[in-house]
Curated annotation (Swiss-Prot):
The keyword Protein biosynthesis applies. GO terms for biological process: translational termination. GO terms for molecular function: ribosomal large subunit binding. This is Ribosome-recycling factor. It comes from Endomicrobium trichonymphae. PANTHER family: MITOCHONDRIAL RIBOSOME RECYCLING FACTOR PSEUDO 1, RIBOSOME RECYCLING FACTOR. HAMAP family: RRF (MF_00040). Belongs to the RRF family. Gene3D superfamilies: 3.30.1360.40, Ribosome-recycling factor. It is found in: Cytoplasm. SUPFAM superfamilies: Ribosome recycling factor, RRF (SSF55194). Coiled coil: none annotated. InterPro entries: Ribosome_recyc_fac, Ribosome_recyc_fac_dom, RRF_sf. Responsible for the release of ribosomes from messenger RNA at the termination of protein biosynthesis. May increase the efficiency of translation by recycling ribosomes from one round of translation to another.
Amino acid sequence: MHTQSFFSAAEEVMKRTIDRLKCELSSIRTGRVNSAAIETIKVESYGSIMPINQIASISVSDARTIEIRPWDVSQLSAIEKAILKADIGMSPANDGKLIRVSVPHLTQERRKEIAKSIGKMAEEFRVAIRNERRVLVENIKKLEKDKVITEDDKKKLEVEAQKVTDGYIKKIDDSIVVKEKEVMQV
């Protein structure tokens, strides 16, 4: 049946959307030091743009410090500039061999700003999921119009499409609640 391939394709897109959300959420800074916040910062290196984690090793040295050890020390200044340019509220210190990034405590005001931006991000991902549902429903309607399925089948499939969509929206909401709690935790 054609509908199964439509559902499979839609679910695959929805799964990738959830994966992207989780990736973006992991890069958001919480009260705890996490190297993921800087791993994906783009650095101009060797004539191309690369994430920091592809040109250096990144480790958390203590509760408030991340160390970046480039594999080529000539990249130190490029990495330092990229961190400053990213404007993520962290200050890099270059000692000639590695970069130490001091992670300041988040103020309550900054925590609220981050939580608000997480909410906006969540809505963008919900819209992406709903758009995929819309495409799925349009395909179902086209099958009915082409007399491949009956009107009853169409209605059942539309209900199923809504259930799938609701499941993925719930995954977004659950992920957001967890991340907002992490951010607001002092």
